[in-house]
A protein has these predicted regions:
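Conserved beta-strand-loop-beta-strand hairpin that lines the nucleotide-binding pocket
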Residues: 1-16, 60-136
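Short, well-structured hydrophobic secondary-structure segments
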Residues: 51, 56-61
């Protein structure tokens, strides 16, 4: 799994919001990320929403802590991080066709241009990057 430095939350063009570890937070986090309006490309927005959903769902199910979603625009790159307070690193699992879970990190890997994990003093940030197709 790729590793990288934590997201620089002090950059201009950076927004963040905390969410409770509840199932409704997945849709709220998707709306938060898309509301930034940093892409007007439908495919990019679908990829953003899908990968955010997967990472937030993992935080809700596995970390079970309040989590922070940070969105940074740097040039033509949109970088999103989901930071939780669990030190347990995500594990990409093999899955069976009929299993309802286990596909999340496979989806992240397929849709994100880059992704990884940054270990924090407390917890971790799972992040991904997408290149903007069109400037909003």
């Amino acid at each position: 799994m790729p590793k990288a430095a934590p997201i620089d939350r002090n950059l201009p063009g950076s927004i963040e919001r905390r969410f409770p570890p509840e199932s409704r937070s997945a849709s709220a986090a998707r709306a938060f990320v898309l509301a930034a309006g940093w892409s007007d490309d439908a495919d990019t927005n679908l990829r953003l929403a899908t990968v955010v959903s997967e990472l937030v769902t993992n935080a809700i199910l596995h970390a079970r802590t309040v989590f922070l979603v940070t969105v940074v625009l740097k040039g033509e790159t949109i970088r999103v991080g989901v930071r939780d307070n669990s030190a347990a690193l995500p594990v990409r699992r093999d899955y069976q066709d009929l299993q309802p879970t286990g596909r999340g990190l496979h989806i992240v890997e397929a849709l994100a241009d880059r992704w990884g994990v940054a270990e924090e003093t407390e917890g971790k940030t799972v992040w991904f990057e997408l290149e903007r197709e069109n400037v909003a």
